[in-house]
Amino acid sequence: MGLKYAILGDIHANWEALSAVLAAAQTQGVTNYCCVGDIVGYNADPEICIEKVRELAGDAVVRGNHDHYCSRQENLNGFHPLAADVVDWTRKRLNEDQRNWLGNLRYSRTVETFMLVHATLDNPEMWGYVFDKLEAEANFAYQMCSVCFFGHTHVPLAFEKAGIV
């Protein structure tokens, strides 16, 4: 039997949802896990979500914008006030090891025969969005595998160009 991957993403510290997804993955015979970022942010359980993703996905995780801002003491000017409050709250909840782990995640990475990125491949640290064919087209040139998984949009999307997804 071959490898079967579950691609996790935009968990946003929602332990109840993550638990349900993991239970469903187990019934589907998933053997490996990856995460396209944003493990933390918005919800109440950042610590346990980080620890579970670390346990299951290991190095097959990339940094999301919420992971980035919650792992460091960067200025939050320009953030929506409620979003800034959530970042501050999450920063206080995480221990040093969790902050360091989040802050050291890569922006993109290759796993086996596919790529992971949270935002865009052309400038992943700028947290741009891929919502349409034009934005996807700009990223295909940076894709080094036939398949790339991304998060950030909270919308299930797929784009294809000459056999590259």
Question: Can you name each region flagged by the protein language model?
Answer:
Residues 2-101:
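Core catalytic region of metal-dependent phosphoesterases/phosphodiesterases
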Residues 4-12, 113-120, 165:
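Active-site-proximal beta-strand elements of phosphoester/diester hydrolases
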Residues 12, 65-66, 118-120, 152-154:
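Histidine-centered divalent metal-coordination motifs
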Residues 25-30, 111, 142-144:
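Glycine-rich phosphate-binding loop signature in dinucleotide/nucleotide-binding domains
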Residues 58, 68, 125-128, 159-165:
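Divalent-metal (often Zn2+) His-rich catalytic cores of metallo-beta-lactamase-fold enzymes
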Residues 78-84, 114-144:
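Active-site-proximal segments of metal-dependent phosphoesterases and phosphodiesterases across multiple
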Residues 107-112, 159-161:
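Short acidic-hydrophobic surface loop/beta-edge motif
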Residues 130-165:
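Conserved beta-sheet core of the metallophosphoesterase superfamily
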